[in-house]
A protein has these predicted regions:
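Short glycine-enriched, charge-decorated loop/helix-capping segments at active-site entrances
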Residues: 38-43, 141-147, 214-223
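Conserved AdoMet/S-adenosylmethionine-binding subsite of the radical SAM
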Residues: 59-69, 78-205, 212
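Conserved alpha-helical substructure of the radical SAM core
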Residues: 38-70
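Canonical Radical SAM [4Fe-4S] cluster-binding loop centered on the CxxxCxxC motif
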Residues: 1, 7-49
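Auxiliary Fe-S-binding modules of radical SAM enzymes
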Residues: 2-14, 171-249
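Short acidic donor-binding/metal-coordinating loop in glycosyltransferase active sites
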Residues: 74-75
Length: 249
């Protein structure tokens, strides 16, 4: 089956456990203000690739990835769910660890046909990295142009399916108040399948791409978030997690 990618990386170290072979899928319905890959937005672009060719390339270098696997990110990878099913099915036949890095924005709880395909994909998925952009609905819409209803419902779906979950959150100065971070911690603290938490500082490395594409940069004038601020935010989220889990005991 053919999929459409923006690019690929053969030495990914931040996209799941170990060294990863990373596919950046083409197409995304979100318009995150801090997106550093605006060239992945178009739905009809990208390089055509065959799932069997991806597996062959990985397998030929499998000793290099002995503690890693394949990660699909984006763009929004779940827009190409049928390609992912075929790719991950073939990967699992060879014992390759599989990971999806997603915003969860495509989740459609009431779409029976979609749920069946998603259920099938999850049987071949070892880890989901879910980017929760913001816990507050209004702030989420300001940051992404979309509601956070689907991403949060997707998180609960993953718990129901007992798919290991790795939460990611980007800290943007002026958008992440303490009460929001604590509430995010309370939400993810209730997820029994939570395996890891990444709190990442907003950076400005994507500014050049916006200039090249002649797109106004939406966070012009907003400073990059410091590592210290990101760690402070993570500590607040962790307090929210611990408060929920302590109450359960």
């Amino acid at each position: 089956m053919t999929g459409y990618i923006h690019s690929k990386e053969s030495f990914g170290t931040v996209d799941g456990p170990g060294i990863r072979y990373v596919l950046f899928m083409q197409g995304c319905p979100m318009r995150c203000l801090y997106c550093h890959n605006p060239d992945t937005w178009k739905m009809n672009g990208g390089e055509a690739v065959k799932s069997e060719d991806i597996i062959e390339e990985y397998w030929n270098n499998r000793h290099f990835y002995h503690d890693g696997g394949i990660t699909v990110t984006g763009g929004e990878p779940l827009l190409q769910i049928d390609f992912l099913i075929e790719l991950f099915r073939a990967a699992k036949e060879k014992g390759i660890h599989t990971c999806i890095d997603t915003s969860g924005i495509t989740y459609a709880e009431k779409d029976v046909a979609y749920r069946k395909r998603l259920d099938l994909l999850m049987t071949y998925t070892d880890l989901v990295m879910l980017d929760i952009k913001h816990i507050d609905p209004d702030c989420h819409r300001r940051l992404t142009s979309r509601s956070n209803e689907r991403p949060l419902a997707f998180a609960k779906y993953l718990e129901e399916k007992n798919v290991p979950l790795w939460i990611r959150h980007v800290v943007v100065d002026g958008y992440d108040k303490e009460e929001h971070l604590y509430a995010l911690g309370e939400f993810i603290g209730r997820l029994s399948n939570l395996r890891a938490l990444d709190v990442l500082p907003y950076h400005t490395m994507g500014v050049t791409k916006y200039k090249e594409l002649n797109i106004p940069y939406p966070l012009e004038g907003v400073s990059a978030t410091s590592r210290e601020r990101a760690q402070e935010a993570k500590n607040i989220i962790l307090r929210g997690i611990y408060s929920v889990r302590k109450a359960k005991k």
